[in-house]
Amino acid sequence: MSFFHAGPAPKGSGPCRGALRDGLDLAPGMKVGLFGGSFNPAHDGHAHVARTALRRLGLDRVVWLVSPQNPLKSSRDTAPLDERMASARAVAATVGPAMIVSDFETRAGTRWTIDTLRAVVARHPGVQFVWLMGSDNLADFHRWRGWTDIMRLMPVAVIARPGSLLDSRTAPAAARFARYRVPAAQAGLLPSLEAPAWTYLSAPLNHRSSTAIRAARAGRGEESNPIG
């Protein structure tokens, strides 16, 4: 299968018109967080972001968009897509029934995040989307292609990650859109707000990272696939 969903039938009037084509079982009126990455491999840090977003933003679903290849990263050490999808499914299952793991970028043929998000929004009218990112990504967000368009396309929630607290709070993207920042105490309103709107969510930090996991496995001579 090319997508994973562990939950009950979604609320609303049924799946959006694009659901059968892209594997995203979403209905109008749902509040949905989108979190993209290579998941090479998926780990507890990814789950931490999902759990925090579900709880603090009041989301109905979190979708992990597993990229065929991150254009900003080397492909040399990237595991095959099917292995990374399996890794993401295994970790998503620990979060709960609100998780969806999708290869939407492969299906849609998009490469850059802004193009992927535009395609998701176009295929799922009526869904309230929020782009999720760790604070480590916010520090370099201004280097992403079309990053200001992302900020204006949907609300953004930044979840604290280890080692990036100071840089992310003073990041160029945070400064550029400072007047659109929503207090964390009002984060539950974010999915219903018109973009640009963003918030920064502090939470107990999880220090797991894909890079550290790959390095540890390489040192032990293990395969990169975290699924036995």
Regions found by a protein language model. Give the residues of each.
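Nucleotidyltransferase catalytic core that binds NTPs
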Residues: S2-G228
